[in-house]
């Protein structure tokens, strides 16, 4: 008897688990198929979650009802807030994960989720009828039928591990690769590219001389990614910092001809922002040293991840490199680093919902779309799961805009601009950074998560209470006038401010650069009555009000452009006035509105003006008809 589901998810990595959970939580009967049930949410590369931009994505996933934040909050060994000396737009959390505990906790969550079924199996083929996906077929011939399919295969598609002059078929960490499914996607007509990533050696902690390294402790205050977390892990493990040196670089130089990167064995394009150590040596040969972070992989293992030493050099050369590094001279290498090549699809073949343009009800998410990183994968998986379930159940799909979330920036970049290298999310990619902050992810997205059925009534009530407290406190400070008495003047001068000439509203005093919410309470001789996150919002929203309002005005302009819809089936070849390059790019991307069209590389303002004229005169509809 053939089993039938609403949604099937292929893969159970960081994209797959979020896709499966989101689909199930929206009420869709969901099947998750994975090559190995023991490797759900496996971390084949760095044992960490978060960092610049990425940490904000994890908060956004949580605000929308996803899982990654809750799981890392329960299983981390260290957590730090980055960029605390900078403005709120670039602050982000980063956690070191206990990679085994993270897997176990995520597997438990998946197994307990209603509507979500898990099965070990390798999908070889999609079942397609009339350009619409109808299910999948495994390598042993079992068929599972469904109304939608989400592919989240990570680096498994035609994966090949490269180490020195050796190259062999493999998924990450020497798991089985997925070869036949990649062939199937090619046969269906998808444009496929070849990308590469890599991982460093792991060493035995007992053999490291930590006295020669610099300790990197976690924060000594409770931190969490999830807005629901109330219990914090304060018993943390440190990381350690060391450096390469001239000796290390000589080993690399002497053996560069053995690197698959430079021997011609690697054909795939590697990540720009996470280069191998040999690539760093060649590209930045003026630098006398490179940072290496020693990151424990968990509480119950001696394996330490040498971040910054990603390499495809032969194993014996990796040992030689380690012997030159302070603290690692006698380190016992437990796993060698390696490079891995894999297939990815050209992401401009997707709609912003992550549904493929070619095959109806087929979605892709994660590294198959050309991204790098667990967080980028999880964000895409969440949205693919939300949209696949929403489409088959007719409960609505959701497209995040560039002003809604970093996840929106990520997906828009992929489907509008494409990528010719593994895509990494950076704060610099977001034009509305001040709106897309770590601290306000819940204020931006919890309403949306609730509307999608991903947020519980209890959580939504707590969120609304927080929002009301923020608004009430801003109003209260706007009504309090502070007098320029000696008590006030002394506190202001103590904190480097200039004396008041007249009375001032508390909210206006808070706007001064040197003032904080704590100082305002000190002047008012009041105790803390609100949660720290409420106080933080009051301070940030007050201090940055002018800049935030400017950003919101820019967003409104773009929204007006987004409201100018373009028919999906528009035949651009019939619009004679368009430049040839613009016609080709518009035909490839098929933008849904004028705003998206304006972001396509090769489409200039003159082309947008022509589209606007056609739109305003009603010609676009006639061209599409």
Curated annotation (Swiss-Prot):
Q: Which residues bind NAD(+)?
A: 270-284
Function of the molecule = NAD-binding protein involved in the addition of a carboxymethylaminomethyl (cmnm) group at the wobble position (U34) of certain tRNAs, forming tRNA-cmnm(5)s(2)U34.
- Alphabetized HAMAP family for the sequence: MnmG_GidA (MF_00129)
Q: Describe, as the record does, how this protein assembles with itself and its partners.
A: Homodimer. Heterotetramer of two MnmE and two MnmG subunits.
Please provide, alphabetically and separated by semicolons, the GO molecular function terms listed in this UniProt record.
Answer: flavin adenine dinucleotide binding
Query: What cofactor is needed?
Result: FAD
Q: Which compartments is it annotated to reside in? A: Cytoplasm
Cross-referenced NCBIfam families: mnmG_gidA
Q: What is this protein called?
A: tRNA uridine 5-carboxymethylaminomethyl modification enzyme MnmG
Q: Which GO terms of the cellular component aspect does the record hold?
A: cytosol
Q: Does the keyword Ligase apply?
A: no
Q: Which family does it belong to?
A: Belongs to the MnmG family.
Binding annotation for FAD = 11-16, 123, 178, 367
List the source organism: Staphylococcus aureus (strain JH9)
What GO terms describe the biological role, i.e. biological process, of this protein? Answer: tRNA methylation; tRNA wobble uridine modification
Instruction: Tell me the Pfam families matching this sequence.
Output: GIDA, GIDA_C_1st, SAM_GIDA_C
Which UniProt keywords are present, listed alphabetically? Cytoplasm, FAD, Flavoprotein, NAD, tRNA processing
Q: What is its main location?
A: cytoplasm
- Name the source's superkingdom: Bacteria
């Amino acid at each position: 008897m053939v089993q039938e589901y609403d949604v099937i998810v292929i893969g159970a990595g960081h994209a797959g688990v979020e896709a499966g959970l989101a689909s199930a939580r929206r009420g869709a009967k969901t099947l998750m198929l994975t090559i190995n049930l023991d490797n759900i949410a496996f971390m084949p590369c760095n044992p960490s979650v978060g960092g610049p931009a990425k940490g904000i994505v994890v908060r956004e996933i949580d605000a929308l009802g996803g899982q990654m934040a809750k799981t890392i909050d329960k299983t981390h060994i260290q957590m730090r807030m980055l960029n605390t000396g900078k403005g709120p737009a670039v602050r982000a959390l980063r956690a070191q994960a206990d990679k085994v505990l993270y897997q176990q906790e995520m597997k438990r969550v998946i197994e307990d989720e209603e509507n979500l079924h898990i099965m070990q199996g390798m999908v070889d083929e999609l079942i397609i009828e009339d350009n619409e996906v109808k299910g999948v077929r495994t390598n042993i011939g079992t068929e599972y039928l469904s109304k939608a399919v989400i592919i989240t295969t990570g680096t498994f598609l035609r994966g090949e591990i490269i180490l020195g002059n050796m190259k062999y078929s493999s998924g990450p960490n020497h798991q089985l690769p997925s070869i036949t499914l990649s062939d199937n996607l090619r046969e269906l007509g998808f444009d496929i590219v070849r990308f590469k990533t890599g991982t460093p050696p792991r060493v035995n902690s007992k053999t490291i001389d930590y006295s020669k390294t610099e300790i990197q402790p976690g924060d000594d205050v409770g931190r969490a990614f999830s807005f629901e977390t109330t219990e914090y892990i304060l018993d943390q493990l440190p990381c350690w910092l060391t450096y390469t040196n001239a000796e290390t670089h000589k080993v690399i130089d002497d053996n560069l001809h053995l690197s698959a990167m430079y021997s011609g064995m690697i054909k795939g394009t590697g990540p720009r922002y996470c280069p191998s150590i040999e690539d760093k040596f060649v590209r930045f040969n003026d630098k006398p040293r490179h940072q290496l972070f020693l990151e424990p992989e968990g509480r119950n293992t001696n394996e330490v991840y040498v971040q910054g030493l990603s390499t495809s050099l032969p194993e014996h050369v990796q040992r030689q490199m380690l012997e030159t590094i302070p603290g690692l001279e006698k380190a016992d290498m437990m796993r060698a680093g390696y490079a891995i090549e894999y297939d990815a699809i050209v992401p401009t073949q997707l709609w912003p919902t992550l549904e493929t343009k070619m095959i109806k009800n087929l979605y892709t998410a994660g590294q198959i779309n050309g991204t790098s990183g667990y967080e980028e994968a999880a964000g895409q998986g969440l949205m693919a799961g939300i949209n696949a379930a929403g489409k088959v159940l007719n409960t609505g799909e959701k497209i995040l805009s560039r002003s809604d979330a970093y996840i929106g920036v990520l997906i828009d970049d992929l489907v509008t601009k494409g990528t010719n290298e593994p895509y990494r999310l950076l704060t610099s990619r977001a034009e509305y950074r001040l709106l897309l902050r770590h601290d306000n992810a819940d204020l931006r997205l919890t309403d949306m998560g609730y509307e999608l059925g991903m947020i519980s009534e209890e959580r939504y009530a707590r969120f609304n209470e927080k929002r009301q407290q923020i608004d009430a406190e801003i109003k209260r400070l706007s009504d309090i006038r502070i007098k320029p008495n000696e008590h006030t003047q002394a506190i202001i001068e103590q904190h480097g401010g200039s004396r008041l000439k007249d009375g001032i509203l508390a909210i206006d005093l808070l706007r001064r650069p040197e003032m904080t919410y704590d100082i305002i309470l000190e002047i008012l001789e009041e105790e803390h009555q609100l949660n720290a996150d409420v106080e933080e919002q009051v301070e940030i929203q007050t201090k940055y009000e002018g800049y935030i309002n400017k950003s919101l005005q820019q967003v409104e302009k773009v929204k007006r452009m987004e409201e100018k819809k373009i028919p999906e089936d528009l035949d651009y070849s019939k619009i004679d006035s368009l430049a040839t390059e613009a016609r080709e790019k518009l035909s490839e991307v098929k933008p849904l509105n004028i705003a998206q069209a304006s972001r396509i590389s090769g489409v200039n303002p003159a082309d947008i003006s022509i589209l606007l004229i056609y739109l305003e005169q009603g010609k676009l509809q006639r061209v599409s008809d």
